[in-house]
Amino acid sequence: MVNFTVDQIRAIMDKEANIRNMSVIAHVDHGKSTLTDSLVCKAGIIASARAGETRFTDTRKDEQERCITIKSTAISLFYELSENDLNFIKQSKDGSGFLINLIDSPGHVDFSSEVTAALRVTDGALVVVDCVSGVCVQTETVLRQAIAERIKPVLMMNKMDRALLELQLEPEELYQTFQRIVENVNVIISTYGEGESGPMGNIMIDPVLGTVGFGSGLHGWAFTLKQFAEMYVAKFAAKGEGQLGPAERAKKVEDMMKKLWGDRYFDPANGKFSKSANSPDGKKLPRTFCQLILDPIFKVFDPIMNFRKEETAKLIEKLDIKLDSEDKDKEGKPLLKAVMRRWLPAGDALLQMITIHLPSPVTAQKYRCELLYEGPPDDEAAMGIKSCDPKGPLMMYISKMVPTSDKGRFYAFGRVFSGVVSTGLKVRIMGPNYTPGKKEDLYLKPIQRTILMMGRYVEPIEDVPCGNIVGLVGVDQFLVKTGTITTFEHAHNMRVMKFSVSPVVRVAVEAKNPADLPKLVEGLKRLAKSDPMVQCIIEESGEHIIAGAGELHLEICLKDLEEDHACIPIKKSDPVVSYRETVSEESNVLCLSKSPNKHNRLYMKARPFPDGLAEDIDKGEVSARQELKARARYLAEKYEWDVAEARKIWCFGPDGTGPNILTDITKGVQYLNEIKDSVVAGFQWATKEGALCEENMRGVRFDVHDVTLHADAIHRGGGQIIPTARRCLYASVLTAQPRLMEPIYLVEIQCPEQVVGGIYGVLNRKRGHVFEESQVAGTPMFVVKAYLPVNESFGFTADLRSNTGGQAFPQCVFDHWQILPGDPFDNSSRGSQVVAETRKRKGLKEGIPALDNFLDKL
């Protein structure tokens, strides 16, 4: 940190209008970390000489070795805008210094939970797209999440050096490439956004407004149309008119920017802009973007890359570029880097784009409050968040835990939305299961220390006001992964994050040396804390299971477990896939079960969900917290449920939120409400451990048809009803053609045309199928999209690379659940093999339990 003291940062923190919280998001390997470097180096935290190679935000050793970002890291930057630039900011501002909290997040699909955590604490996002390969599956996933969280995007087209040097594109082709990417991104924004009438207004990106940057992170240069518009305005102003005031100048630059993009043409003969592609005397005119922006850049590239010394020297003089003495003797690519870096420094262009176009916390929290806060929209906490008020009650969201150098302790990483958090402040620490007025998941504790996160360093700081991102010490014992910290007694929680992937791949781990078991258990606890996505489960058979999003994610988790969290050698099983149990038709008989004392009877049936309902429950479109009538209306309209039945949903399961439903369609049963809790408990138990092989159920609707109860309350207690309900639910599943569901990945593969055949071969061997194949316009690359069962995905990447000579790059992301073909009762089918394997692994009795165990006769 070169010229920056904590006191200086603390002073800017009070100016909420001048803070920008932003994350950098992109597809894997589109150059996020490299770009982040040029920002960091501009803001004066690493030495500029090293920018581009340091990858400052990749703090972990394995990140630097693998050249991928795994965890999201935070850095504060400081940038001062010149007086001229301040006029471009349309929101309120306070002075010319800006504090930018930047979070570099991973692009790998397996780590998209890290991205979700990063998005929650930011208000804006820099979306990086490789201009050669275009918008990919991960860009889309993350952008969709960002827009759902009401985060405003700006776009950066990275890797222009590749487009110019490798693909040797003509200016017009390059323009078309950019135009297409802008359109693709806007399609995503308009599909998932709320439109111009929504609370955020229009968030479409548009080069004319200056919300699109172009450049190369590796070479360290970038520009938006604003930079070139300023050059030309200055050039024309120098010819005749006198000095312009900052406001008029801004107006002129904005007019100029409108002319530099789209179907506008420039006539070099008389220096006039025209709207038609032909000049009055019929010559074809060049497009302004090509003539006035790309052409100068090509003119810089051409003499330098062809080693024409005299031309190069003239050019450097004309552009008024002052090279360092050591740069003067370079030639070829190194010289090109030096010249472009001086002429169009990436840091300036991007930081200007960020400060001018991304919202400050004051602006953003107005429209994000309803998404962030679960409580009523007019209580003290909500008002404090809406106005980002440092005098309001403290409201802070912890989005993840960051491991410290001290083994086993974590910093809680999060953002202050209202009030001020300070060292020693007594706060209420509320976990995700806290409900106002109850005591569970609530701790009253003082905060030991507040710290600033600085990439590889932390700096202690006295207190931090709202709108800022901060780390806390001494909170980690009371929270698992996320939570809310507040001083307001009646505060509700901040809303829990929705992850776009679900943990479907599991590994069993055990310590090589049995004496190390306590260390392993402790290590698993820490692992669950440090990664927002991972689940650690202890099976009844006593084995420890780690569930993650995919092979790479699990590999990193196991490495962390072995080296950082447990510090012991570990044995691990092969990865196994979670399955779900479901039914494929309605139960063929009405199932009856009697309680152990034979005095109570339950009658039920099971039937499958209509298509799409399970996904709606996963997304939270239909949930237990919803208002009853609204939910009934939704189910009746979209899925044609009977309205009366839709109103009588008892609960969702497993865990009260899962994709199974228990409805009550009984008529006039006495004492029904007294046993409701017991039946619900039995339902939660049965859906968590299904009848086939004790996996979760999915997409099953159970109807309670009739109940006969004993008149005495003592004979219908929980001990009688819960096991009965469970047996009855199992019976109704087994009579409804039960099936297994397996998780399916969506695979996107980028490859050159000649190896597409090899890809089909690999996918067919692994039960995958291709459903879309398209060529990336303007390049020789093909994009193949396919569905691939997760079970077959282990070693898929290696297999694919060996069959295509390493030219195909797959990206797998969990997409949906699909029914495994074949009846699990038929011994030759795939389903029955899976059931047998799973039962054996879990140490259950062989063979699916017989129906007679669950079904009683009258």
UniProtKB/Swiss-Prot annotation:
According to the UniProt entry, the cross-link of type Glycyl lysine isopeptide (Lys-Gly) (interchain with G-Cter in SUMO) is at: K322, K529
Q: How is it modified after translation?
A: Phosphorylation by EF-2 kinase completely inactivates EF-2; it requires prior phosphorylation by CDK2 at Ser-595 during mitotic prometaphase. Phosphorylation by CSK promotes SUMOylation, proteolytic cleavage, and nuclear translocation if the C-terminal fragment.
Cite the GO molecular-function annotations of the record: GTP binding; GTPase activity; ribosome binding; translation elongation factor activity
Relate the outcome reported for changing I714N: Prevents H-715 diphthamide modification and its subsequent ADP-ribosylation by diphtheria toxin. Prevents inhibition of protein synthesis by diphtheria toxin
Show the coiled coil region(s). Answer: none
Key word Kinase present: no
Impact when changing G719D: Prevents H-715 diphthamide modification and its subsequent ADP-ribosylation by diphtheria toxin. Prevents inhibition of protein synthesis by diphtheria toxin
Return the InterPro entries for the record.
EFG_II, EFG_III/V, EFG_V-like, EFTu-like_2, G_TR_CS, P-loop_NTPase, Ribosomal_Su5_D2-typ_SF, Ribsml_uS5_D2-typ_fold_subgr
- The identity of this protein, by name, is Elongation factor 2
Q: Which residues carry this modification: N6-succinyllysine?
A: K152, K272, K572
Q: Where in the cell is it found?
A: Cytoplasm; Nucleus
Kindly give the Pfam families that the UniProt entry links to this protein: EFG_C, EFG_III, EFG_IV, GTP_EFTU, GTP_EFTU_D2
Q: What does this protein do?
A: Catalyzes the GTP-dependent ribosomal translocation step during translation elongation. During this step, the ribosome changes from the pre-translocational (PRE) to the post-translocational (POST) state as the newly formed A-site-bound peptidyl-tRNA and P-site-bound deacylated tRNA move to the P and E sites, respectively. Catalyzes the coordinated movement of the two tRNA molecules, the mRNA and conformational changes in the ribosome.
* Post-translational modification Diphthamide, affected residues: H715
List the source organism.
Cricetulus griseus (Chinese hamster)
Q: Which residues carry this modification: (Microbial infection) ADP-ribosyldiphthamide?
A: H715
The main location class comes to cytoplasm
**GO terms under cellular component:** cytoplasm; cytosol; nucleus; ribonucleoprotein complex
* Residue positions where Phosphothreonine is found in the record: T54, T57, T59, T435
> Where is the tr-type G domain positioned along the sequence?
17-362
| Phylogenetic classification of the source organism | Eukaryota, Metazoa, Chordata, Craniata, Vertebrata
Location in chain, cross-link Glycyl lysine isopeptide (Lys-Gly) (interchain with G-Cter in SUMO1): K239
Query: What EC number(s) does the entry state?
Result: 3.6.5.-
Reaction(s) catalysed by this chain, per the record, are:
GTP + H2O = GDP + phosphate + H(+)
A GO BP entry = translational elongation
Q: Which segments cross the bilayer?
A: none
List of residues that carry N6,N6,N6-trimethyllysine: K525
